[in-house]
Each structure stands twice: as structure tokens, then as C-alpha cells.
């Protein structure tokens, strides 16, 4: 009689299939998203009990999904690990992409007064768009500014013969020259002085390219002293005429 010992060994990890990749937007006032983690599909030929853990940026879960995870903006790699009763393990990964689709919050000055600063025919002033800001912000980072006039002095010569603005150097006045498209600076000239409030639209952009807008009233003042040129000296005879 011979005794034969046959040992059955399980060296294979469970089969695990991760959920499909997906995208989600950030929460309204935070640069993160609270995601309900989905469950992976797991199966093992030898074990009835398979445990799953989930690792994600900044955290760890001891269950096969079924909990909320707070994820930052960007591509987040999620790792699922399945363990059978023989301590074999298998892994799979998925990607959850968090996008910032929330526009920034624009805050404008109610009213701005601009004084002309240059002499000559135009009295031109270019005002940085950021001057019209009064605390605009975005939950995910810094914002940038551009602005435009809502209308312009149509009869005023904004090219090199007047205000000296000709962005594409063609000698023709266009919307860029008049300041009616969003630019880093907004032009004002002597034709604006005393003309009443000029409406300016401030464009606020966040790092993800989301845009939002607010309006400012601008009054232009002409504080430039007039230029006077006296006639040449003359000599008049006492016998005149």
C-alpha cells in the first residue's frame, strides 16, 4: 500500500474587470468632484469570498466601490485590487477625468472714471482690462481679463491720423481699432470726453477656458490743458499809420 499525497494549490488571482473610464465636472464652488465609485466585476474559480480594495489619488477604499471619493481636476487613475482566500491578487485600472466646466465669477466696478492722459489731436488713453475688475475669482485658480467697449465714436479717426491705433496696420478703422472686441486694453479718446457713460464689458477667463462677463460704466474726463501758440512778436512804428 502506498500513500500518495496530492496537493491542490491555487496560484491564480481572481479575474477582475474595471468599470469603463468616464468624465465628470467639478462641484459648483470647489475645484474637486465627489464621485460615487462604481464596482468592478470580479470572479474566482476557487474562492467564494473575494475582497476588493480601491486606491485613488488621495485616498483608499476597502470595498468594491459603493462609496464617495473626492477627486481633483485632471485624469485620476483608479486601481482596483481583488484578493481571493488564498491571498492571490489581481489588479485593473480605470481613469476618471475631472473637468472644470464651471465659469468664473465676474465682479466689476459699478462705475469707473478715466482721464485722458496724452496731448495732441486724440488725447488717447488705453486702460488695462484688469482696472475694471473688482474681485473676480474662480475656484480652480487665477483668472485673466479682457474688455471691450460696447460702442465707439463712429466719426472719430482711430487710425494713425487720430488716436494712433491701427492693430493690423492697414490704415482702415476696424472694430479692433475702436476697442469693440475683447482686448487686454480698452482705448478712450477725446471724442469720449463729456459724452456720457460708456458701457464696457469685462471678460473673465479661467485656466480651463471658461468665460463669464460683467458690465462697467465708464465716464471719460478731459483734464488735459489746451495748447496755445501765440503769434510771433511784431514791431509797430509810432508813426503807424
Give the label of every model feature segment.
Residues 1-241:
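Proline-threonine-serine-rich low-complexity tracts
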Amino acid at each position: 500500500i502506498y500513500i500518495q499525497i496530492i496537493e491542490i494549490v491555487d496560484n491564480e488571482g481572481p479575474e477582475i474587470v474595471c468599470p469603463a473610464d468616464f468624465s465628470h465636472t467639478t462641484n459648483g464652488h470647489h475645484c474637486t468632484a465627489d464621485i460615487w465609485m462604481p464596482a468592478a466585476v470580479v470572479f474566482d474559480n476557487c474562492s467564494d469570498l473575494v475582497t476588493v480594495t480601491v486606491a485613488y489619488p488621495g485616498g483608499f477604499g476597502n470595498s468594491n466601490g459603493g462609496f464617495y471619493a473626492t477627486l481633483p481636476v485632471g485624469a485620476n487613475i483608479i486601481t482596483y485590487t481583488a484578493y481571493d482566500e488564498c491571498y492571490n491578487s489581481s489588479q485593473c485600472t480605470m481613469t476618471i477625468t475631472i473637468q472644470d466646466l464651471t465659469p468664473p465669477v465676474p465682479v466689476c466696478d459699478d462705475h469707473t472714471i478715466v482721464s485722458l492722459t496724452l496731448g495732441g489731436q486724440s488725447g488717447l488713453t488705453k486702460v488695462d482690462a484688469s482696472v475694471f475688475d473688482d474681485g473676480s475669482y474662480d475656484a480652480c485658480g487665477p483668472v485673466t481679463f479682457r474688455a471691450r467697449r460696447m460702442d465707439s465714436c463712429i466719426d472719430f479717426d482711430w487710425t494713425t491720423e487720430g488716436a494712433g491705433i491701427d492693430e493690423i496696420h492697414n490704415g482702415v478703422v476696424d472694430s479692433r481699432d475702436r476697442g469693440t472686441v475683447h482686448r487686454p486694453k480698452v482705448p478712450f479718446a477725446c471724442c469720449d470726453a463729456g459724452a456720457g457713460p460708456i458701457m464696457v464689458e469685462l471678460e473673465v477667463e479661467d485656466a480651463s477656458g471658461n468665460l463669464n462677463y460683467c458690465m462697467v460704466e465708464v465716464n471719460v474726463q478731459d483734464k488735459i490743458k489746451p495748447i496755445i501758440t501765440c503769434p510771433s512778436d511784431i514791431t509797430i512804428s509810432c508813426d503807424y499809420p
